[in-house]
Design a protein with these regions (language model features):
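Alpha-helical scaffold elements lining the catalytic groove of polysaccharide deacetylases
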Residues: 197-202, 206, 653-657, 661, ...
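Non-catalytic, conformational "gating/processing" segments within enzyme and secreted inhibitor domains
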Residues: 146, 153, 207-239, 439, ...
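Bacterial N-terminal signal peptides
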Residues: 8-18
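Proteolytic maturation boundary segments
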Residues: 20-44, 228-268, 279, 310, ...
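M16 family metallopeptidases and their MPP-like homologs
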Residues: 48, 53-69, 75-79, 93-139, ...
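A common structural junction motif
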Residues: 134-144, 239-247, 355-366, 595-602, ...
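Bacterial N-terminal signal peptides that target proteins for export
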Residues: 1-9
Length: 929
């Protein structure tokens, strides 16, 4: 498996790091200017211009979620999220098809309070996105059929299996809300709802729910990006104006839930380690105490220096993890603390320490520094999130969120100010008010070996009939045509070289006051010595755990003091150190950044702490079928003698010494083996002297080029099974060794795989998900590396159709080779999709830095991105057929399946040519004898 260790400081409010610099309360956020109109039918339209990238986002929110359902009819809001992609009156076909051809990306989501849908497309396809959204708002029911409904019910059941039943601790959330909220409360059930309710629902039930809530007066539309508001308003009137207004919406009005005593429950799960959950009722989102409760969560658990981390995780080392957060919703909120026990430790020990920390913060308010640290990180997160116009959490999504829940799209500054008003006394007060003995204490413990796993609703429904989705011919000439294509030009790269040989690439982007620095080292995990797999990743992970002048806590606190993000990673072909900061803190950020890169010390205590935590993580990864499938698949393909076949394991983790880390670091972390990529609000002329001052003492040294052994060859296809008793799904991975990144066949392979399995509308996904209903999603892809990386096609499928799913995968792999010939229309569709999607990957500073990092790692031509469209357009049908037959060989495939052997084995044995010689492996890929 590809070993990675990324220390990413998450932007989510509940996970902000602690800092030490006082928040600058006078600072204002960059303004998000917008125009707003309301149509006669009640649709609220919000428009925000951002011409930095030639893309536009369309974002629609419906003020309906699972809380608008009633007992016995749960899951409707989430089901409609799926149904809205199945075709409507004027486009009765898969919703993704025209938008992905346009180079767009799209998605939707449902939570208890709202349902949202979004598209991000090249700016000349704005009318297409508006037409599609309007047609499903006004014409979904006219195209709804029982076949579509049954198909999407199957997809939802697969989603349940994949995201709940087949995940470690996956049912904790639904169990918690069922205990916290009474049966009559609309938060008593989760968004996915009851599968029994969905199965029992009639077409009339489903249509009635849609007519009530999916109406323009219960929706808001945001358009953000590169467009003309006057023209956009005309298009909105054209496509949405005739949709009928719905009846007035009645919002749920229920009493605030309360617990009158402590509730204690314990559940068994297929997990390695026990986990404790504590939950309390609090307040709704935007309540006067909401901000203080969020800050309480940050003080308790956000970052290495936080109270729970420093005590339970790094101090006493009784917990593998600990988190505290306040997930407030529209009509209620809660506070939750979660912690997983280390091996040999008990949940009783965990609970005792958690209780002590709760009592301490009640009696001892957090320091002013603790409060300020949280506020600085919050401020940064507001600005960092303004980079994207679309997607989840982008500007269009935020404008819609504020419009829906507070009635003011421009609530950004006001929202920040409510956090800035939080005092230490406020945090102590809310802890005393809400974290009482009237709480839910829920534990998940490992199921005893040999004990049968109880059947869930989803598992019990494994034999449900699978509905084939009906196919409808659509006249695509009725779709709006795009305006002229916007011209994409790759960003201008300024280059210089420091006195020690370090290359510096800079792309100036001044739309927002942020800068990212990405130091790319041209060596990664392929340099791991035999017997020390994981060395590169461990070296990377420990870079910021201590330098000659700073401890791990010092580094964390200083980074957080400026609201920055520092992360490290190691991949097959490279290692990297990234710092994202506000421009006003660039000098301080650079000081920390340069120190971590040049002066890592790998303190013995930190090495041992990391080793112990890694050994626990290695034990935990057996719980996750997807991780197991990845590890085993790569080992089956490459064996133990090739670096692509091995990952960190118990033996290598125990064998790794501090001297090994220092040797790897001193060998490969050299300026002549690196390129520093800087993107954002920075000037090369001003920055270069600062870089020279910080890096001048960093000395170059000879770095030998990496050489890879030849990958092993396969002489026949084989099925490999890893038994996971009681698994709710079978995770299937099928493939073979692929091709290196610098192959002349790179572009034909990209086009071929786009047709086969890299997008929602690909052959594999449309077959296994949309046509058969076997899975929540199926995909394929090449992992392009310096050496020949793996090709894989994969999906988590219903256990009952494991054999059938394998056969459909094989059918599609044979089909792309010629049994189901690629058509000229398929070829053109996928080429245009690839070409038109390129500008989206240059929107944020980190996206730009990531694209340039690929140029560094694989020595791509300077004009690579400008030439991208020409290279893709040059791919012919003959090219696609040639590479499919050259690189996909069905008679030599490795087929790895992680699932319930007892259930799936009889069917697998029936597969002609494969079923007679199944190999059985453990979770590390070792043969079971």
């Amino acid at each position: 498996m590809n070993t990675k260790r990324t220390l990413v400081f998450l932007l989510a409010l509940s996970l902000f790091m602690t800092t030490v610099v006082s928040a600058q309360k006078s600072d204002k956020l960059p303004p998000i200017k917008y125009q707003e109109v309301t149509l006669k039918n009640g649709l609220r339209v919000i428009m925000h211009e951002d011409h930095s990238t030639p893309i536009v986002a369309v974002n629609v929110w419906y003020h309906v979620g699972s809380k608008n359902e009633v007992a016995g009819r749960t899951g409707f809001a989430h089901l409609f999220e799926h149904m809205m992609f199945q075709g409507s009156k004027n486009y009765d076909n898969d919703y993704f098809t025209p938008l992905q051809e346009a180079g767009g990306t799209l998605n939707g989501s449902t939570n208890p309070d709202r349902t949202n849908y979004w598209e991000v497309v090249p700016s000349n396809f704005l009318e297409l996105a508006l037409f599609m959204e309007a047609d499903r708002m006004g014409g979904l029911l006219e195209a709804m059929t029982m076949e579509k409904l049954n198909n999407q019910r199957d997809v939802v059941k697969n989603e349940r299996r994949q995201n709940y039943d087949n995940q470690p601790y996956g049912t904790a959330g639904e169990k918690a809300v069922a205990l916290l909220y009474p049966k009559e409360h609309p938060y008593h059930w989760t968004t996915i709802g009851s599968l029994d309710d969905l199965t029992a629902a009639s077409m009339d039930d489903v249509k009635a729910f849609f007519r009530q809530y999916y109406v323009p007066n219960n929706a808001s539309l945001v358009i953000a990006g590169d467009f003309d508001p006057k023209e956009a308003q005309k298009l909105v009137e054209k496509h949405f104006g005739s949709i009928a207004k719905g009846a007035a919406i009645t919002r749920p009005n229920v009493p605030t839930p309360k617990l009158d005593k402590e509730i204690r429950v314990q559940y068994e799960d297929n997990v390695q380690l026990p986990r404790l959950y504590m939950s309390w009722h609090t307040v709704p989102r935007f309540d006067k105490d909401d901000a203080a409760l969020n800050v309480l969560g940050l003080v308790l658990s956000a970052g290495r220096g936080s109270r729970l981390q420093s005590n339970l995780v790094y101090g006493k080392q009784i917990a593998q993890d600990a988190s505290a957060f306040a997930p407030a919703q529209e009509i209620a909120g809660r506070f939750q603390i979660t912690s997983t026990a280390r091996p040999g430790k008990t949940l009783e020990e965990i609970e005792k320490e958690l209780n002590a920390e709760i009592e301490r913060i009640k009696k001892e308010p957090p320091t002013a520094d603790e409060i300020a640290r949280a506020l600085n990180q919050i401020e940064s997160s507001f600005i960092f999130s303004m980079q994207s116009v679309g997607g989840f959490g982008g500007k269009s999504d935020q404008l819609n969120s504020y419009a829906t829940f507070v009635g003011k799209p421009d609530y950004f500054q006001t929202d920040l100010e409510r956090f800035r008003r939080v005092t230490p006394a406020d945090v102590s007060r809310v802890a005393n008010t809400y974290l009482t003995d009237k709480r839910l204490v829920m534990s998940f413990v490992p199921r005893p070996k040999g004990k049968e796993m109880p059947k869930t609703n989803a598992a019990a429904n494994q034999q449900a009939s699978v509905s084939k989705k009906e196919k409808t011919k659509v006249d695509s000439t009725k779709l709006p045509k795009p305006t002229a294509n916007p011209k994409f030009v790759q960003p201008n790269i300024e280059k210089t070289k420091l006195s020690n040989g370090l290359e510096v690439w800079l792309v100036k982007q001044s739309e927002l006051p942020i800068v990212t620095m990405n130091m790319v080292f041209k060596t990664g995990t392929t340099a791991d010595p035999r017997g020390l797999s994981g060395l590169a990743a461990t070296t990377s992970a420990l870079l910021d755990d201590g330098t000659k002048t700073r401890s791990a806590v010092d580094i964390a606190n200083e980074v957080q003091s400026i609201g920055a993000q520092l992360s490290t990673l190691s991949d097959d072909d490279y290692s990297g150190v990234r710092m994202l900061t506000l421009t006003k803190h660039l000098d301080k950020a650079l000081d920390i950044y340069a120190d971590v890169i040049q002066n890592a010390e790998f303190p013995e205590t930190e090495v041992e702490t990391y080793r112990n935590r890694t050994l626990v993580s290695l034990k935990q990864r057996r719980d996750n079928a997807n991780i197991v499938a990845n590890i085993v698949y790569n080992r089956v393909l490459y064996g133990d003698a090739h670096p692509y076949g091995v990952t960190i394991n118990e033996a290598s983790a125990k064998a790794m010494k501090r001297d090994d880390l220092k040797k790897y670091y001193s060998t490969y972390y050299r300026p002549n083996n690196a390129v520093l990529i800087v993107v954002g609000d920075a000037d090369l002329k001003t920055l270069t002297p600062k870089l020279e001052a910080k890096f001048k003492d960093w000395k170059p040294s000879e770095v030998s080029p990496m050489s890879l052994p030849d990958a092993p060859t396969r002489d026949k296809a084989m099925i490999y099974v890893v038994d996971k008793p009681g698994a709710a799904q079978s995770v299937i991975t099928i493939g073979q060794i692929g091709v290196e990144r610098n192959s002349p066949d790179y572009f034909p392979l990209q086009v071929m795989n786009s047709i086969l399995g890299s997008s929602f509308t690909s052959r594999i996904n449309m077959n296994l998900r949309e046509d058969k209903g076997y899975t929540y999603g199926a995909r394929s892809g090449f992992s392009f590396r310096h050496g020949a990386g793996p090709f894989s096609a994969s999906a988590g499928v219903q256990t009952a159709v494991t054999k059938e799913s394998v056969m459909e995968f094989l059918k599609e792999l044979r089909g792309i080779r010629g049994e189901i010939p690629v058509t000229p229309a398929e070829l053109e569709y996928n080429k245009q999709s690839l070409i038109r999607s390129l500008p989206r990957s240059f929107e944020t500073v980190d996206q730009i830095a990531g694209q340039l990092a690929n140029s560094v790692i694989y020595n791509l031509p300077e004009t690579y991105f400008n030439d991208f469209a020409v290279r893709v357009n040059a791919v012919t049908l003959e090219d696609v057929n040639r590479v499919a037959n050259k690189y996909l060989t069905p008679d030599k495939l490795a087929i790895v399946i992680v699932g319930d052997r007892k259930t799936i084995e009889p069917g697998l044995k029936q597969i002609e040519g494969l079923g007679s010689s199944i190999v059985y492996l453990d979770a590390e890929g070792n043969p079971i004898r």
